[in-house]
Amino acid sequence: MAEDNYNLAQADLRIVSGEQGSGKSTLATALIVDDCYSHLTGIINTDTGEYRKAQPLNENEIKSLESKGITYHLLKHIRVFSNVDDSSRIVVKPKGWVIDSPIRVFTNYQLFGIRHKLIGAEDIIESINDDTITDAWLALDESVFTDKQDSMTSLVKMVAKFMAQARRRMLHVIIIAQEASMIATRFILFSTTRIECSYDEDTYIVDYEVSNNSKVMQSSFLYAPDYWKFFKTREIVKQPQYKVDKILTEMYKPSKR
């Protein structure tokens, strides 16, 4: 479980950085997944579509489990209700079922087991004057529209204007990059939290240090395999097609003689 020691009730822009293979995407995914599981309202059978009301365990239920020698895990233990009567019981979430959660999630990389919407730059631009992307998580993994090298383009400038509305939109933004210096300055200025990751291949632990605007540094960790099933660890995040087309056009443009 990723330990989130800052208030999710407030809008936040987190910059998650670290070298390749440091667990950046794992941590970003963990923050989103943990929030969805903490607010789950049901579970759905992926084969039959059957729906069962469910909820996360409360503090007393967690203590009761642990008093029996059972180690509680947010992603495993839930209370499920009967579809016949009002009875319920604590179970380990069965295989083949995904959670139903009111938490809204927008990402530029694929997630599994969590309801979300894949978005590109055009989705952000098109929603800048409406409330489509509000009260939600917005995670951008090594995205071209936060890249410092493109900081003077109209695209990045417009996305930056959108990010400036993060608090009013109640967004929990995560920008992922190998180095914070690779992110356009505007986003650095808007950031409220910096997270630096490192990964231990022997223990499968992602260690991370969190600092916020109060200069308080906190260290924590998570067990990476708990979250690998929620995303493709080797997914290649696609670049906007118009940028690819533009470069190809320039490459194959006849040379002047």
Regions picked out by a protein language model, each given a short descriptive name:
Residues 1, 193-195, 207-257:
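Conserved P-loop NTPase motor module
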Residues 16:
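Hydrophobic anchor at the beta1->P-loop junction of P-loop NTPases
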Residues 19:
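P-loop (Walker A) phosphate-binding loop of NTP-binding proteins
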Residues 24-25:
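Conserved lysine of the Walker
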Residues 114-169:
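Conserved nucleotide-sensing/catalytic segment adjacent to the nucleotide-binding pocket
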